[in-house]
A protein has these predicted regions:
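Non-catalytic DNA-recognition/assembly elements of restriction-modification systems
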Residues: 1-23, 48, 146, 150-158, ...
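Generic alpha-helical structural signal
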Residues: 13, 72, 112, 158-161, ...
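Hydrophobic structural patches
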Residues: 1-2, 160-171
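A generic structural signal for alpha-helix starts
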Residues: 7, 108-109, 122, 154-155, ...
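DNA target-recognition domains and sequence-specific DNA-contacting regions of bacterial/archaeal
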Residues: 13-149
Length: 182
C-alpha cells in the first residue's frame, strides 16, 4: 500500500456507484420474516472473505417497510457500527441490518481491490480517526467518503489482487502442511 500511496489519492466516495446502510424490519411483525426469501445479513455472517451463505431471511414486504435495500452480488459488505471493519464480498444479492454498509463498486473499481483496500491497515487507521462514539461506535458513510485512497488503473488493480491471491493460496497450503505434520 505504501507504494500506491505515493500516487494521487481520491476520496472514497469516488469508488462506488451506490453505498448505504441497511435496516432491520420490525421484528414483531411476523409477515416481515415468515417464509422470507431475501438474504438478510448480520455481523456474524461477515466471517469470511466471500459471503456464500447466511441463516436469516426477510420478505419483500419486510424490505419495503424498512430502510433495507437489495445489494447486488459482487459488492463489498462492510460493518461500520459496533464491530467496525468486518468485511465480505457477497456472492449473491443481499439486504443488511443497520450498522452494515453495502458498497456497489464503480465500473473502474475491481471488487477484489476494493476489498483489499478496505481490509488494509491504512484504511483501518483512517477509519479509527473518524469513529463517532455514542451509544455505540460508528463510522458514518458521510465521513468514510472523505478518506483519501489510492486508485490504480484496472490492470494494476488486477495485478495487485492476483498477487495477494497467490500469497493467500501459498499461506493456506503452508498452514495445511503444518496441520498435517502436527
Amino acid at each position: 500500500m505504501t507504494v500506491l500511496l505515493k500516487g494521487k489519492l481520491y476520496p472514497f466516495s469516488s469508488f462506488y456507484i451506490k453505498a448505504g446502510e441497511g435496516g432491520t424490519p420490525t421484528t414483531s411483525v411476523v409477515e416481515y420474516y415468515t417464509e422470507g426469501t431475501i438474504p438478510f445479513i448480520k455481523i456474524e455472517d461477515l466471517s469470511c472473505k466471500y459471503l456464500t451463505n447466511n441463516k436469516d431471511f426477510i420478505t419483500e414486504l419486510g424490505m419495503q417497510k424498512s430502510s433495507a435495500w437489495l445489494i447486488p452480488s459482487k459488492s463489498v459488505i462492510y460493518s461500520n457500527g459496533a464491530t467496525i471493519g468486518a468485511i465480505s464480498i457477497n456472492e449473491y444479492p443481499v439486504c443488511t441490518k443497520q450498522g452494515i454498509l453495502g458498497i456497489v463498486p464503480n465500473t473502474n473499481i475491481n471488487v477484489e481491490y476494493l476489498y483489499l483496500l478496505m481490509s488494509s491497515s491504512y484504511f483501518s487507521k483512517e477509519i479509527s480517526r473518524i469513529i463517532t462514539e455514542g451509544t455505540m461506535k460508528t463510522a458514518y458513510l458521510k465521513d468514510i467518503n472523505h478518506i483519501k485512497c489510492p486508485l490504480p488503473s484496472m490492470a494494476q488493480q488486477k495485478n495487485i489482487t492476483n498477487l495477494t491471491s497467490s500469497i493467500e493460496e501459498k499461506l493456506s497450503i503452508e498452514q495445511e502442511l503444518l496441520r498435517f505434520l502436527n
